[in-house]
From Swiss-Prot:
Record field: catalytic activity: GTP + H2O = GDP + phosphate + H(+)
Keyword Repressor included in the entry's annotation: no
Organism from which the protein derives: Neisseria gonorrhoeae (strain ATCC 700825 / FA 1090)
Listed name of the protein: Elongation factor 4
Taxonomy of the source species: Bacteria, Pseudomonadati, Pseudomonadota, Betaproteobacteria, Neisseriales
NCBIfam families, sorted: lepA, small_GTP
Disulphide-bridged cysteine pairs: none
InterPro entries associated with the record: EF-4, EFG_III/V, EFG_V-like, EFTu-like_2, G_TR_CS, LepA_C_sf, LepA_CTD, LepA_IV
Signal peptide limits: none
Length: 597
């Protein structure tokens, strides 16, 4: 056991985490050259394209160190994006050490800081590594200083390497052996193994990635999941190198995969503890929590007969992504669809993109919303995640909205812009620290403001330099009202928004004029109105037009005219008729682009 090293890599998006992992695999001979592809551990196409890691993957590598001993290095790849912070904390809790990979030209960014603090809280040894030192813009001294100022760990003499060209990779491996402690644990104690990740395989069912903390797990053992009390039998054990290699047993300190008869991911929850039925552990390992959805959106198939196919696709995605929640929903405007819960905006985009790419679905997505707590005058408390479900204004005592604490790292010259943006979004400044050339701003922001377009605006006001990390803080009472959009006097439920009273009139006007541009002209005038309760606050008109398809028929047979008229009808089949008005997909997205004043 003293020759095992479990470690993960913490890095901001694009700082070279996956490339470094590739180099380790190549260096330790995990795959031969013809099997090497770039970013071996990022197995989903969308991971490679966006250059982000979503699911944790592992590789167990045998490394012959300079002292002549062979070490087993277990690399657990972590996601770097803020939406997946629970997955990160689970990956880190399975390790004794973490490599903090920082781009030597760009320096420290907010997500690196957040994940690094998570690591330090979990008592993980953090080893700084400067990557991309072969870039002309690299400035290792400045970045070492930044690591010390911002994160507060000693970075003098941090290992320098370039994962792309392979310089210094061996030094990094030596550093892992020297600095990261060996795992502790008792092979003879009752089994405790934490599930670091789980995914669905079409042939064997659920594959769990586990880290054995205490005890030993063998083939054919009967095991129990401690949070759900489900019991099952071990069918396969092994390690990834990153190819899977079968083993007879896994001992304390090792990381590997476990396949049982479980068919549903809901039973193998990330962070749960696995123990033996025959000799169970008394306590589960700490740190397990149910994942809460933060952002909700409606997903509707463009063709209503694709409803079942969409349900199928969502169920298949849920097999690989336990944090995706969904339930059926009916909208008068869009027909049948699903209300889905996500960890954050990136998660929403990824799910949407995977549905379109892997399952070939055509989707309409409504504007993302967050969960509000509504206290009724009767004293009852309800949760509302869909604006169209908000009870009547008369029966509401108060509405509470979720507040998040956001940490923003930004270069000094853009501080003013970012502060203005946060104030526009009803933010409250909590803290501001100068660290070298960077400034760390801490704000309490309403989550409702963040899900719309905060991230894009933050990037544009800071020319792409600001980086953001956030976590949920609490629910706070706020002056919120529901804004309805009416087309031809009928409410379009999918376009309702919950907004703050101050910005309601402005938002209503913006939306109405946006809708006027987007709704195609019809054979009759259309009124687009924005309303708060029964008060109309804005109105726009869409002028009428008519196309005459029979213009080219002089006399001739009636069937010819009928054919042309039928053809005209068929062309309108897909347009969703809302009070006989077709509302295109772009109109539902317009909500996202309404500016706030």
């Amino acid at each position: 056991m003293k020759n095992i090293r479990n470690f993960s890599i913490i890095a901001h998006i694009d700082h070279g985490k996956s490339t470094l992992a590739d180099r380790f695999i190549q260096y330790c001979g995990g795959l031969d050259l013809r099997e090497m592809s770039t970013q071996v551990l990022d197995s989903m196409d969308i991971e490679k394209e966006r250059g982000i890691t979503i699911k944790a993957q592992t590789a167990a590598l045998n490394y012959k160190a300079r002292d002549g001993q062979v070490y087993q290095l277990n690399l657990i790849d972590t996601p770097g994006h803020v939406d997946f912070s629970y997955e990160v904390s689970r990956s880190l809790s399975a390790c004794e050490g973490a490599l903090l990979v920082v781009d030597a030209s760009q320096g420290v960014e907010a997500q690196t800081v957040a994940n690094c603090y998570t690591a330090i809280d979990l008592g993980v040894e953090v080893v700084p590594v400067l990557n991309k030192i072969d870039l002309p813009a690299a400035d290792p001294e400045r970045v070492e200083q930044e690591i010390e100022d911002i994160i507060g760990i000693d970075a003098v003499g941090a290992v320098q390497c370039s994962a792309k060209s392979g310089i210094g990779v061996e030094d990094v491996l030596e550093e892992i052996v020297a600095k990261i402690p060996a795992p502790t644990g008792d092979e003879n104690a009752p089994l405790q193994a934490v599930i670091v990740d789980s995914w669905f395989d079409n042939y064997v069912g659920v594959v769990m990635l586990i880290r054995v903390k205490n005890g030993t797990i063998k083939l054919k053992d009967k095991v129990r999941f401690m949070s759900t009390k489900a019991e099952t039998q071990v069918e396969q054990l092994g390690v990834f190198t990153p190819k899977s290699v079968q083993k007879q047993e896994l001992k304390a300190g090792e990381v590997g995969f476990l396949i049982t008869g479980v068919k549903e991911l809901g039973q193998a929850k990330v962070g749960d503890t696995v123990t033996l039925v025959a000799n169970p552990a008394t306590e589960p390992l700490p740190g397990f929590q149910e994942v809460q959805s933060q952002v909700f959106a409606g997903l509707y198939p463009v063709e209503s007969h694709d409803y079942e196919a969409l349900r199928d696709a969502l169920e298949k995605l849920q097999l690989n992504d336990a944090s995706l929640k969904f339930e059926p929903e009916v909208s008068q405007a869009l027909g049948f669809g699903f209300r889905c819960g996500f960890l954050g905006l990136l998660h929403l985009e990824i799910v949407q993109e995977r549905l379109e790419r892997e399952f070939d679905m055509d989707l309409i997505t409504t504007a993302p919303t967050v969960v509000y707590e509504v206290v009724l005058k009767s004293g009852e408390k309800i949760e509302v995640e869909n604006p169209s479900k908000l009870p009547d204004i008369g029966s509401i005592e108060t509405i509470l909205e979720p507040i998040i604490t956001a940490t923003i790292l930004v270069p000094q010259e853009y501080v003013g812009n970012v502060m203005t943006l946060c104030n526009q979004k009803r933010g409250v400044q909590v803290n501001m620290q100068y660290m070298g050339r960077q400034v760390m701003l801490t704000y309490d922001l309403p989550m409702n403001e963040v899900v719309m377009d905060f991230f894009d605006k933050l990037k544009s006001t800071s020319r792409g330099y600001a980086s953001l990390d956030y976590h949920f803080k609490e629910f706070q009472p706020s002056d919120l009202i529901k804004l309805d959009i009416m087309v031809n006097g009928e409410k379009v439920d999918a376009l309702s928004l919950i907004v703050h009273r101050q910005s309601a009139v402005h938002k209503g006007r913006e939306l109405a004029s946006k809708m006027r541009e987007l709704i195609p002209r019809q054979m009759f005038d259309i009124a687009v109105q924005a309303a708060i309760g029964s008060r109309i606050i804005a109105r726009e008109n869409v002028k009428a037009l008519r196309k005459n398809v029979l213009a080219k028929c002089y006399g001739g047979d009636i069937t010819r005219k009928k054919k042309l008229l039928e053809k005209q009808k068929a062309g309108k089949r897909r347009m969703k008729q809302v009070g006989n008005v077709e509302i295109p997909q772009s109109a539902f997205l317009a909500i996202l682009q309404v500016s706030d004043k």
